[in-house]
Amino acid sequence: DILAAFRVTPQPGVPPEEAGAAVAAESSTGTWTTVWTDGLTSLDRYKGRCYGIEPVPGEEDQYIAYVAYPLDLFEEGSVTNMFTSIVGNVFGFKALRALRLEDLRIPPAYIKTFQGPPHGIQVERDKLNKYGRPLLGCTIKPKLGLSAKNYGRAVYECLRGGLDFTKDDENVNSQPFMRWRDRFLFCAEAINKAQAETGEIKGHYLNATAGTCEEMIKRAVFARGLGVPIVMHDYLTGGFTANTSLAHYCRDNGLLLHIHRAMHAVIDRQKNHGIHFRVLRKALRMSGGDHIHSGTVVGKLEGERDITLGFVDLLRDDFIEKDRSXGIYFTQDWVSLPGVIPVASGGIHVWHMPALTEIFGGDSVLQFGGGTLGHPWGNAPGAVANRVALEACVQARNEGRDLAVEGNEIIREASKWSPELAAACEVWKEIRFNFKAVDTLDPLKS
């Protein structure tokens, strides 16, 4: 069975047991009345079952309802069908004030019907010939308004300065100021030039997201013809069917696939209603993607440390034990489905490098947009500053130093022999994003 954990907030007067049973029925075989065609099938075989309810500590009138769904309810290899069944209609149920899907346990039998990520972590490392450290990226800014040639120039400067990747912003598709084909051509030229000068393999996340699946695949085909290593997709706005189609193309044609989570906070940010991002991540690993944006803990975007660490485990590891302290409701066995690299992006700069290296570890992408392009000396020096800071943190980690305790000292030491890093440290020394998180973990039962 697929197991689901729902956070249920019933309407006043509705018992939690009745609310849990209603969720199970409405998201499987049930309707609002008995119908004569019920007798033509075996409902016991197909109906969802609410097998447990527990109150949420510290919350009034909130409960976690556990529901089991028989596998025969779902089409093989279709995240679209899985979500249509489990969350497609029940969230508008009048008997509930609010409903949130907190977690799913996907059984190995169902996981085996999915291709998953086009390549996975180890294959990407081998393609790039880069090991033992996080990868460095940068989103080109301003995100909208640049011509294709100026955009390509910024890509070249960042890659030449020491970054591994640059990135299209999620809303860069094919607008009047910069059509996709022109952008792809100038970015490919920038990649080739930077590779020739540095001797390193470089990439730019060319956003293939489009209004139709056919147009999306056409853009991916063009990118492959240019010889670039990676393309990009906005998987929530583009949809799971489009994403799975692109992931299959990327595996068949040797392209890495970077995934942006644009629109996720509309779905996952409120604590009592929607779908938790850990569920959207599991769905992405099934649908297919080699990278996905994951918050930063320390940057400008929502994301508690323990919740984010739970996300990272679900993306990268083969087997994850149930751990309510990190928000993981079920033990998950991925049966060797390739892992996904988490991407830390959003309001980060060189002073964050030690914390990011410690939190995300080696198999990650640390992506500095404004933290590269906002350097007072230009794009290439901004890239140099980030590369020097990263190399210093990796060396300190390998020497056994505590990045959480000694992080600022490590950055100061490195800045003594890197004027680019020293300038970056001075510019961003006062930048903080100290806001209370909206989506937090529930207190554990005492």
UniProtKB/Swiss-Prot annotation:
Its cofactor is Mg(2+). The modification N6-carboxylysine is found at residue 167. GO terms for cellular component: chloroplast. Coiled coil: none annotated. It comes from the Eukaryota. Keywords: Calvin cycle, Carbon dioxide fixation, Chloroplast, Disulfide bond, Lyase, Magnesium, Metal-binding, Monooxygenase, Oxidoreductase, Photorespiration, Photosynthesis, Plastid. The active site is at 141 (proton acceptor), 260 (proton acceptor). The disulfide bond which can form in the large chain dimeric partners within the hexadecamer appears to be associated with oxidative stress and protein turnover. The record marks 300 as: Transition state stabilizer. Binds 1 Mg(2+) ion per subunit. The keyword Magnesium applies. Substrate binds at residues 89, 139, 143, 261, 293, 345. RuBisCO catalyzes two reactions: the carboxylation of D-ribulose 1,5-bisphosphate, the primary event in carbon dioxide fixation, as well as the oxidative fragmentation of the pentose substrate in the photorespiration process. Both reactions occur simultaneously and in competition at the same active site. The basic functional RuBisCO is composed of a large chain homodimer in a 'head-to-tail' conformation. In form I RuBisCO this homodimer is arranged in a barrel-like tetramer with the small subunits forming a tetrameric 'cap' on each end of the 'barrel'. Belongs to the RuBisCO large chain family. Type I subfamily. Heterohexadecamer of 8 large chains and 8 small chains; disulfide-linked. The disulfide link is formed within the large subunit homodimers. This is Ribulose bisphosphate carboxylase large chain. It comes from Exacum affine.
